[in-house]
């Protein structure tokens, strides 16, 4: 019998930052979930989350579906051994950790018309904005972040102003915690999940599917 497939978001679903746990939620960090660029622990699981992760890894096929890029997911300390959907769905990694070539070709074709627009948007906005790249030098989406979570009104005000300057046709805007992202409509977790599930069903047949997440972008899968 095929194992169930569990599609799960990562940040604020399976783990969260120490700051959020201690300062906002009064939770005790139990186990490292992810490290920062200097390889110091940054995000943690509660004991309950740790137990859930271990159970899912043993009883199901756990597939992360995350906004994290391919570099960021490499810093997650959960031993995934199946597929992974990263970068808001722009990249699908095989169990060997390599981009799926069929999905890569599809996404490169979909993103080609957005390259000039994304570059122009980033160039005309202040230093809060940056482009996220995958597949070498392919711009995938633009994101603005604020390090101070008590000043998110400033971030949202700038985001509102940008929406009046740049037409949002062909994009959708994802606001989550301390960041606002402008994503091309082909870059979407739900589209990547649907493609991967169709591929796996063609290979394996029927299997149960469960989705876990914390935001509207996760509702799509």
Predicted regions and their residues:
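Short loop/turn segments at strand-loop or loop-helix junctions that form parts
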Residues: 8-20, 87-89, 95-97, 136-137, ...
